[in-house]
């Protein structure tokens, strides 16, 4: 069946968009959707323990959000410049989104902080994208931690008191422009309890790009072009997942980024799980044939977003929109700092 963009729309009261993280990560609410039984249960995230069984694997994305927003000036004019780091091309060359782009030509220099970091535009691309090369003394990531800000999603209007609350407790690999937010609910203590139950904890890496916030503009969703994101699944992770599968356990993904990684690999290797890394622009939507993931944890996503379509590919459109309407009635909190779903 052909879907249009409006098929994935729903009305969300503005006050249900969570502006701040909940005090204790795992006390957020959890809406459990049993896809086969077509049932909904209202729980809390710490109840996820009851949903996981010995022999299952929980997959998490260990990408870390970088303080990817920098504010600088052009020394020759004093003009202000905003830079958003998208990804590291090679060495000190980065693909960035710069404002005001039309004034930033090849050869333009920008200075950050009190001059401990400078950058030169090396290539102009469309949509405000620029390649820039950084110049500095010392360690780039340490300088970035000092000078950069963590970019929050556009619908979050409040400043974050503690930047660590926009990182998962297992964030390790620098590279994301946005957090893999389903993972924000996990605490180290809860993960320890999960492991003690005989569930395997598996880490993959997918660096979340800003395209994750890019709205779908095509009425026919088939025409939408997905952004690309870098992913990696190492040999140890692949071996664990294959062992779990062989023994009849479930592969449970934490978040859409883990899903995209696992399904990219499953699609590429015709259902098999192999170590792999590369760039993925997989668009999972209704009609998609699932290869790897048996169940997953995810937050509540924006109306008309590719992430709602991804979830609908697992549940069917009507079932997920019905669950969202239930969540709205029950005043669940939505989006990045909001509550979670467990879909099985």
UniProtKB/Swiss-Prot annotation:
The keyword Cytoplasm applies. Pathway: tRNA modification; tRNA-queuosine biosynthesis. Signal peptide: none annotated. GO terms for molecular function: S-adenosylmethionine:tRNA ribosyltransferase-isomerase activity. Its main location: cytoplasm. GO terms for cellular component: cytoplasm. Disulfide bonds: none annotated. SUPFAM superfamilies: QueA-like. Monomer. This is S-adenosylmethionine:tRNA ribosyltransferase-isomerase.
């Amino acid at each position: 069946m052909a879907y249009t963009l409006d098929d994935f729309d729903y009305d969300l009261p503005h006050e249900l968009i969570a502006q701040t993280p909940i005090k204790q990560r795992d006390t957020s609410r959890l809406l459990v959707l049993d896809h086969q039984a077509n049932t909904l249960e209202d729980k809390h995230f710490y109840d996820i323990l009851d949903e996981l069984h010995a022999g299952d694997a929980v997959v998490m994305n260990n990408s870390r959000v970088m303080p990817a927003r920098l504010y600088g000036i052009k020394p020759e004019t004093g003009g202000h410049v905003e830079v958003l780091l998208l990804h590291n091309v090679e060495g000190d060359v980065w693909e960035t989104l710069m404002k005001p782009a039309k004034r930033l030509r090849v050869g333009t220099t920008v200075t950050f902080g009190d001059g401990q970091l400078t950058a030169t535009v090396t290539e102009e691309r469309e949509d405000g994208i620029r390649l820039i090369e950084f110049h500095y003394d010392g360690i780039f990531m340490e300088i970035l931690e000092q000078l950069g800000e963590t970019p929050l999603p556009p619908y979050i209007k409040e400043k974050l008191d503690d930047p660590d609350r926009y990182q998962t407790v297992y964030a390790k690999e620098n590279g994301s422009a946005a957090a893999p937010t389903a993972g924000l609910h996990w605490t180290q203590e809860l993960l320890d309890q999960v492991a003690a139950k005989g569930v395997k904890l598996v880490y993959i890496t997918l660096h979340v790009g800003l395209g994750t916030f890019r709205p779908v503009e095509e009425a026919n969703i088939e025409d939408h072009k997905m952004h690309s994101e870098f992913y990696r699944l190492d040999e140890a992770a692949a071996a664990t997942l294959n062992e779990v599968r062989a023994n009849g356990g479930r592969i449970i993904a934490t978040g859409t980024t883990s899903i995209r990684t696992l399904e990219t690999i499953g699609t590429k290797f015709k259902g098999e799980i192999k170590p792999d890394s590369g760039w993925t622009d997989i668009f999972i939507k209704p009609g998609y044939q699932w290869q790897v993931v048996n169940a997953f944890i995810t937050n509540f996503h924006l109306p008309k977003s590719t992430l709602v379509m991804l979830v609908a590919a697992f549940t069917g459109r009507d079932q997920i929109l019905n669950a969202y309407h239930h969540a709205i009635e029950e005043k669940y909190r939505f989006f990045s700092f909001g509550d979670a779903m467990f879909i099985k």
